[in-house]
Design a protein with these regions (language model features):
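Gram-negative bacterial Sec-dependent N-terminal signal peptides
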Residues: 2-19
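Predominantly soluble domains enriched in secretory-pathway, periplasmic, or organellar proteins
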Residues: 18-392
Length: 392
């Protein structure tokens, strides 16, 4: 972790780095908690006025500014900013939005941070973004309009709209080596119903839709809601993991080079550990550990995949908060920060950030900065100098 000190600029309410002490800075987008959740606060809190923003928080337990917000990027109160993704060289951050047909793009080389608005008129309920290996194109899933938007990675303008055969695209993964993009079919955005059961393969170079694969062993309609998907870095043959949000299972999609197609199979059932709502997927640097969050109850689950990716071995389930969702990992892979909130849903919106010592496999602290102000964090990533991509 970088050694710096912080000088408070009182008039601007900002803090700026110079030489002296430790810090790890994270980007955390947030929104006000639900009206029902806000009733629990006995005293007035800022979140009671509908707000959104991206907070830059010092998450280093060794820092004198631990838990402090050192900078804020304001966002419209009706944007419903959802995820934050870095492009391949981590020069820009892309922020998706559930409430507007827009992307926010942040130039990470300039402080204080500002967000450029990019209109994506064909995209309703923007979810996930991935980038081609050459950083020249981005791919955005749109759960409300059932589209995949392909954009220019330099100008950030949309250049192609792909209509998908399966509705409600959410999770997305790309593998340039086999020229494939995989997209999940999740749920109807308006009411979280009509759950999907497929993933769809698209030719990455052209945007041509190729095939769809059912990732459930139940009779249709299975209602399993595949939500996230991610390729294991460096795996040969290529293999991607899929989390089924409502089905409570983990599946694999393994590339069959002879058929130029994917074989899908169930890899793990979270019901065996009395966990549900599996969400995000991450890997360690060696790609022999798989991390999966489960929102109910909130846990960070660690699997050994060194022997057989098709049969991940659960090593430990580390308690986090209700709604355990996104995870940020430090470059040295010593610490993980688990953001605990899912769509402001009851029972899955704790609002804290759990700090996990990955070497010990235990919780060492919690950051309640946003929670205590009546906000829920929706995503977390560390700034590039501290961030491990964890397969993303």
């Amino acid at each position: 972790m970088k050694r710096i000190c912080v000088i408070a600029v009182m008039g601007a309410g900002l803090m700026w780095p110079c030489a002296g002490s430790a810090e790890i800075l994270a980007l955390v987008n947030y929104e006000s908690k639900s009206e029902e959740a806000l009733k629990a606060f006995r005293s007035p809190v800022p979140g009671q006025r509908r707000q959104e923003g991206i907070a830059v928080i010092d998450v280093d337990p060794a820092s004198p500014n631990f838990k402090k917000i050192v900078e804020t990027i304001p966002l419209p109160a009706d944007l419903v900013a959802h995820h934050i993704f870095y492009n391949r060289d981590s020069s820009k951050a892309y922020v998706t939005a559930l409430g507007k047909a827009e992307l926010r793009v942040i130039d990470l080389s300039k402080r204080p941070f500002t967000a450029k608005t990019v209109a994506v008129p064909d995209c309703q309920v923007g979810e996930d973004v991935v980038f081609s290996a050459d950083n020249k194109r981005w791919f955005l899933t749109c759960m409300g309009s059932s589209k995949l938007i392909i954009g220019d990675g330099v100008t950030d303008q949309p250049i192609q709209t792909v209509s998908l055969p399966q509705p409600y695209p959410h999770g997305i993964a790309i593998h340039d080596g086999i020229d494939r993009v995989l997209v999940t079919s999740t749920v109807r955005a308006t009411d979280l119903k009509d759950a999907g059961e497929h993933i769809t393969a698209i030719e990455a170079s052209t945007g041509k839709v190729l095939s769809s694969y059912k990732v459930s062993s139940k009779p249709s309609p299975a209602g399993d809601a595949p939500v996230e998907i991610l390729f294991v870095p460096g795996a040969n043959p290529p293999v991607a993991y899929v989390t089924n949000m409502f089905g409570g299972t983990l599946w694999t999609a393994t590339w069959n080079a002879q058929k130029k197609d994917f074989d899908v199979a169930q890899a793990f059932d979270f019901a065996t550990i009395k966990a549900g709502v599996p969400l995000e997927i991450y890997f360690n640097g060696k790609s022999d550990r798989l991390y999966v969050t489960t929102a109910k109850p909130g846990h960070l689950n660690i699997f050994d995949i060194s022997k057989n990716a098709a049969k991940p071995e659960l090593l430990k389930s580390i308690p986090a908060g209700e709604g355990a969702h996104h995870v940020a990992v430090t470059k040295d892979e010593k610490l993980a920060f688990v953001q605990n909130s899912l769509l402001n849903l009851p029972g899955m919106s704790d609002g804290s950030i759990t700090i996990v010592d990955l070497a010990k496999g235990e919780v060492i602290g919690s950051i309640d900065t946003l929670k205590d102000q009546g906000f829920n964090p929706n995503c977390i990533v560390l700034l590039p100098q501290w961030n491990h991509p964890a397969g993303h």
